[in-house]
Amino acid sequence: MRLQRFELGYAGTVLRRDLVGAVLRGDKTATASLLSDYQPTTAEPLPVVGHRYLLVGYADEPVGIVETTQLRILPAQDVDLQFARDEGEGFETVASWRAAHERFWGHRLITDNTPIVCERFRLVRRLYAKRGRAHLPSQ
């Protein structure tokens, strides 16, 4: 079975490196995205609770397998501090979480009512690169 990709930030960026590192350390167990980034607006389907995804690293290499454990679609104003903290990026206020995400989402207008996909996940397994290919670690 081929797993869909789980991408954080953009490939080749410091942000991607830092976010993936936070997942691998266990610091990041949540992520937020705009509902408009998913179907039917784009070809990207919403994550599904219980499904597993291939976490990709800095250069789009496979680095882990994650499983979605919760999915909520909330107005931006309803994202809470615990979720912001669980994103593992050092947010200590919802205002700092929102400001950082508004910068990341760039030119798109974010209002209090903008639908945000709040996804919680767990790291199921790390993958290790070997000669340019990922493999499961020995158990």
Residue ranges of model-derived segments:
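Mixed-charge, low-complexity intrinsically disordered regions
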Residues: M1-I65, T69-Q139
